Curated annotation (Swiss-Prot):
Keywords, alphabetical: Gluconeogenesis, Glycolysis, Isomerase
UniProt pathway annotation: Carbohydrate degradation; glycolysis; pyruvate from D-glyceraldehyde 3-phosphate: step 3/5
Organism: Bacteroides thetaiotaomicron (strain ATCC 29148 / DSM 2079 / JCM 5827 / CCUG 10774 / NCTC 10582 / VPI-5482 / E50)
Catalysed reactions, semicolon-separated: (2R)-2-phosphoglycerate = (2R)-3-phosphoglycerate
Residues forming the catalytic site: 9, 87
Keyword Kinase: no
Residues binding substrate: 8-15, 21-22, 60, 87-90, 98, 114-115, 183-184
Alphabetized HAMAP family for the sequence: PGAM_GpmA
Described function: Catalyzes the interconversion of 2-phosphoglycerate and 3-phosphoglycerate.
Protein name: 2,3-bisphosphoglycerate-dependent phosphoglycerate mutase 2
């Protein structure tokens, strides 16, 4: 049975500080590295091998992938990076503490910014140095395609062309693929694969560095999906993600 494993990056510095990260290129914490290495060990122990891996342009995802492949002795497999797998762009919220923002604007407003389907935060200005137009890694991406902010819908609209043109077609000639990305970019893929409604997708909270496996039948329809790990531990990790946008 063919498989695609989705993996959110390990804890980043701004995950630890409970900040809106988006396209800001922050590194993994020591805990994040350990989480990524644990994911690699878990995948190896469950007998997984990957034919190809995909990740974003952001170092927290790239380094997570490197840790996983190292622990699996799969450093040699082909890896494809795409800006389309980047996290949702949080606009002018990037860098702000989520709990402090909830104190200022209310938990409901922060939940809307974090989890609503089609409402985006305020955009970055054209002169803001956080604007991706100033980042050389995106010099081959047209200015019209680079976001200044995004809703989850915008994020999915960015990701799905790449999913449809590159990742999913590769499954025809491969047995197992690995996608290491971000909470919201992976949420978009999961929404597509499981046909989750716009209303229900905002309730999905992905923990860091816990492998999420999708199995496909001979017609490449989803046959099964599951997390690898202790169900109770995973439930607690999901609750922790859900609580990030609440007041202190």
């Amino acid at each position: 049975m063919k498989k695609i494993v989705l993996l959110r990056h390990g804890e980043s510095a701004w995950n630890k500080e409970n900040r809106f990260t988006g396209w800001t290129d922050v590194d993994l914490t020591e805990k994040g590295v350990a989480e990524a290495e644990k994911a690699g060990v878990t995948l190896r122990e469950y007998g997984f091998n990957f034919d190809k891996a995909y990740t974003s342009y952001l170092k927290r995802a790239v380094k997570t992938l490197n840790c996983v492949l190292d622990k699996m002795n799969l450093d040699w497999i082909p890896v494809e990076k795409s800006w389309r797998l980047n996290e949702k762009h949080y606009g002018d919220l990037q860098g702000l503490n989520k709990a402090e923002t909830a104190e200022k604007y209310g938990e409901e407003q922060v939940l809307i910014w974090r989890r609503s389907y089609d409402i985006a935060p305020n955009p970055l200005s054209e002169s803001d140095l956080r604007n991706p137009r100033f980042d050389y890694r995106y010099h081959e991406v047209s200015d019209a395609e680079l976001p200044r902010t995004e809703s989850l819908k915008d994020t999915i609209d960015r990701i799905m062309p790449y999913w449809e043109s590159d990742i999913f077609p590769a499954l025809k000639d491969a047995h197992t693929l690995l996608v290491v990305a971000h909470g919201n970019s992976l949420r978009g893929i999961i929404k597509h694969l499981k046909h989750i409604s716009d209303e229900d997708i905002i309730k999905l909270n992905l923990p860091t560095a816990v492998p999420y496996v999708f199995e496909f039948d001979e017609n490449l329809n989803v046959a099964n999906d599951y997390f690898l790990g202790n169900p109770e531990e995973i439930r607690k990790l999901m609750e922790a993600v859900a609580n990030q946008g609440k007041k202190k």
